[in-house]
């Protein structure tokens, strides 16, 4: 099982989207929350920066990066918790599992550590910074599977974003799409995808160890 991190393991997407909105407004780009979800949730920080620079016709320097990181860090330290039900789901899981996230290793070390989940995945954590193309390209999921010596068709992915779901499908992996976050269920539905809304449902959906892969 390959788990996304933000919005699947740690309940960070609501926080991130809100901070994104504040940061973008500070730069002069006003976006509604649902627009931010569609454009950026599931994508890498590099994609976010490139999109903002192209949209606003400017180069975001180190000062901006430090300010942005400070806003994120403050919000996460105050509000970040594990996704409801994920601890119970992981306790029942009988499959080898890893994390493959658009976030950086430093970010995952912080968020998984803060929520008490780091030890469950240590040594099996993959970041989009390790591959040429982030989600919705399949590179990250294929990299994780290849590193762990598992064929893509024998893998399943737990995702919460439309971009992540697309990446998993493109990798030839079955997707368990969590609709309990910021992305509406209808944007997650599609072939090879099981949509669910409560993490406590996950073990039963995969048969507590035997996902029904296509």
Name these PLM-found stretches.
Residues 23-24, 44-58, 111, 145:
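Helix-loop "lid/cap" segments that line or gate small-molecule binding pockets
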Residues 40, 44, 67, 81-85, ...:
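Short beta->alpha linker loops
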Residues 74-99, 105-109:
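Short, acidic loop-to-helix structural element flanking the phosphoryl-transfer center
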Residues 17, 21, 37, 45-50, ...:
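An amphipathic alpha-helix signature
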Residues 50-88:
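Metal-dependent phosphoesterase signature
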Residues 95, 104-214:
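Asp-based, Mg2+/Mn2+-dependent phosphohydrolase catalytic module
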Residues 1-38:
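Active-site neighborhood of HAD-like aspartate-dependent phosphohydrolases
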Residues 26-30, 56-59, 116-120, 149-150:
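Short helix-capping segments at alpha-helix termini
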């Amino acid at each position: 099982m390959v788990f996304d991190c933000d919005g699947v393991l740690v309940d960070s997407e609501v926080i991130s989207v809100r901070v994104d909105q504040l940061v973008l407004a500070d730069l002069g780009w006003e976006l509604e929350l649902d627009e931010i979800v569609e454009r950026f949730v599931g994508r890498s920080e590099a994609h976010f920066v490139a999109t903002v620079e192209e949209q606003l016709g400017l180069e975001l320097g180190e000062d901006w990066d430090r300010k942005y990181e400070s806003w994120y860090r403050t919000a996460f330290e105050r509000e970040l918790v594990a996704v409801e039900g994920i601890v119970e789901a992981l306790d029942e899981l009988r499959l080898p599992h890893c994390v493959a996230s658009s976030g950086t290793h430093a970010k995952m070390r912080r968020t998984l550590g803060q929520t008490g989940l780091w030890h469950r995945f240590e040594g099996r954590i993959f970041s989009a910074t390790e591959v040429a193309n982030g989600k919705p390209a399949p590179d990250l999921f294929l990299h994780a599977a290849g590193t762990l010596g598992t064929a893509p068709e024998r893998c399943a992915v737990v995702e919460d974003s439309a971009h992540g779901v697309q990446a998993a499908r493109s990798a030839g992996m079955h997707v368990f799409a969590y609709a309990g976050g910021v992305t509406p269920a209808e944007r997650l539905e599609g072939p090879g995808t099981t949509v669910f809304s409560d993490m406590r449902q996950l073990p039963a959906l995969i048969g507590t160890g035997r996902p029904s892969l296509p």
